Amino acid sequence: MEKRVTFAGNSPITQNAAAEDSQADEKIFLLSPANLKGVRGQRMLNSNIKSALGDRLRAEGACLAELFCHTSSLYFRGKLAYARFFARPPSGLEGSFIITSSKGLLAPDTVVDIATAKELASGAEIDLEDDRYRIPLRRDAEALQKALPEGCQVVLLGSVATEKYVTPLKESFGRRLLFPSAFLGRGDMSRGALLLRCVRENRELTYSPAEMKGREGRRRS
């Protein structure tokens, strides 16, 4: 697996026409992951069940974002599209990273092999009590924090209802860590639809400081 928290190279699709009108000159996104432990994820990882993506994953690897888009509902696809459209990373940095259960922060186009995919699906829990999750995340968040120029915003596209994301990320990014205010009170499907609509309309959401907000909606990922 190619570890991409070296921050080398920008995605070619992080530019958008609204850049001059948005809230900050520079902005990156952190995406909560999709669940590889569900039925679609397990079918993809099962060598006895044939699929184009599963076969490619076993033969040569596949991009992490592709795996999550395959297994996810609308929510992850919305997060990925929104981050790619509205990110304005500083020179030399990625515009978005995916929070993982045991590999810290990975760029969406990181190629993972079948062993890594199975580890992400069945290994560490996204729980602050699990060092396999917490330590790599803090390591990569600290490295990213040191690489970011002053004024660059870090936007969490994920739940702020529990401490599993907010607490470790806040320790590294402090006040620059934000989240979309419109996420409050919405479930995952509603958030995904909202994010895709924002991309279609070239309309960026308003962000608030990331603090734990209690119950947000039916699901919190």
Regions found by a protein language model. Give the residues of each.
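Peripheral peptide segments
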Residues: 2-221
